[in-house]
Amino acid sequence: NTPGIVGFGRATALAKEKMEARTKKEVELRDYLIKRVLDEVPYTKLNGDKVKRLPNNVNFSFRFIEGESLLIMLDQKGICASSGSACTSGSLDPSHVLLAIGLPHEIAHGSLRLTLSDETTKEEIDYTVEAIKTVVERLRSMSPLYEDFVKKNKQ
């Protein structure tokens, strides 16, 4: 399949030409997203190393939040996300990777995985962060565990 081989070679060359710029943009957007979420959403944890990670991937855990509810409400706002690892997409079980790095089951269950691309814009990140803040606040307002936590910490 000579045409296929030639086409694959050309596609590889094009990808290599754009890889450095694409990676740089994705890292900048990823780091911006991480900073905003950690600064603006209380009781949130970044899962995995802050630097040694894929340039286009973030995974957060939100205490007192059920992952499935989070996904449904974000989906209603037009945000496509996952609650587990890519290996468990479509499953309601928490990510086995998050459990393996020591997250308790209830925190791993409230995880959110977002994937960016070089086509993602800063405005889309801003929209996503605002949506996350709104949804997390709404879900926590319905959580008896969060209510108990707040009461105990006010004393």
Please provide the spans of the model-predicted regions.
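Anionic-ligand binding region
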Residues: I34-V37, P42-M73
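Flexible, glycine/charged-enriched surface loops at secondary-structure junctions
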Residues: E20-E26, P42-D49, G84, L139-D148
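A short glycine-threonine-serine/GTX helix/turn-capping micro-motif
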Residues: N1-P3, K16-A21, N59
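Structural signature of PLP-dependent enzymes
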Residues: T12-K35, K45-L54
